Amino acid sequence: MSFIVYPALDIRDGRVVRLRQGDYAQETSYGDDPLPRTQAFAAQGAQWMHLVDLDAARAGGYTLAPLLSSIRAQTTLQVQTGGGVRGRDDVARILDAGAGRVVVGSLAVRRPDEVVGWLEEFGAERITIALDARQDAQGQWQLPVHGWTENADVTLDDLARRYARAGMRHLLCTDIARDGMLAGPNISLYQHLSALLPGVAVQASGGIRDVADVAEARAAGCGGAILGKALLEQRMDLAEALAC
């Protein structure tokens, strides 16, 4: 399985931002024009990037189609993107706008029967299942829902296995406690998921600080790593990360 480094941009009101642990009230802005950043990603050798529509994630209705089209026209990047996917037609529209893969998050927890059907309809290579997880006091990985205020009635392991049986090829898993914290990725979580889900490219997301963390994620069996805040704050060289 190849290992893919995904430089990431989160977009809100047209700006490049980062949220601390997903909290819209804890936002840091990194400028108004995302396109030059994507061009820099490509110039440094990236083949893929990860693009998140934070406005749509909150209110629905994917808003980044014009940006996505510009990225595809002006760079060589393939784009994995999501935010605000509320149904099948949203997936189709985002793919039609030029996405290489569509990220399906909260709906993957709330309506798995429907999302399983999309793996077959659109192809498992075109869908990334994204699960935000938090470890409880008993060591079980739960899936918080409703703004991370309560847990779903299914665990991370059980839902991930269900999607794997249905043909899932790409799983993006974020340890909520590490998101935007630059505290290092939860390597034990990714070792566990990689062993649990043979043949699935598990993407490490949350807490990656430097090239050593990227190398550690790869060694843990991951198929990819999402690089967000560390790149924006120039704590990491993308070309070095791509060489891991």
UniProtKB/Swiss-Prot annotation:
- Which InterPro entries would you find in this protein's record? Aldolase_TIM, His_biosynth, HisA_bact_arch, Isoase_HisA-like, Isoase_HisA-like_bact, RibuloseP-bd_barrel
Reactions accelerated catalytically: 1-(5-phospho-beta-D-ribosyl)-5-[(5-phospho-beta-D-ribosylamino)methylideneamino]imidazole-4-carboxamide = 5-[(5-phospho-1-deoxy-D-ribulos-1-ylimino)methylamino]-1-(5-phospho-beta-D-ribosyl)imidazole-4-carboxamide
Q: Which GO terms describe its molecular function?
A: 1-(5-phosphoribosyl)-5-[(5-phosphoribosylamino)methylideneamino]imidazole-4-carboxamide isomerase activity
EC number annotated for this UniProt entry: 5.3.1.16
Q: Which HAMAP family does the record associate with it?
A: HisA
Q: Does the keyword Transcription apply?
A: no
Keywords from the UniProt entry: Amino-acid biosynthesis, Cytoplasm, Histidine biosynthesis, Isomerase
Q: What is this protein called?
A: 1-(5-phosphoribosyl)-5-[(5-phosphoribosylamino)methylideneamino] imidazole-4-carboxamide isomerase
Q: Which organism is it from?
A: Stenotrophomonas maltophilia (strain R551-3)
Gene Ontology CC annotation, any one: cytoplasm
Family per record: Belongs to the HisA/HisF family.
Single biological process term from Gene Ontology:
L-histidine biosynthetic process
Q: Where in the cell is it found?
A: Cytoplasm
Question: Which SUPFAM superfamilies does the UniProt record give?
Answer: Ribulose-phoshate binding barrel
Active-site residues from the entry = D10 (proton acceptor), D132 (proton donor)
Pathway membership: Amino-acid biosynthesis; L-histidine biosynthesis; L-histidine from 5-phospho-alpha-D-ribose 1-diphosphate: step 4/9
Is the keyword Cytoplasm in the record?
Answer: yes
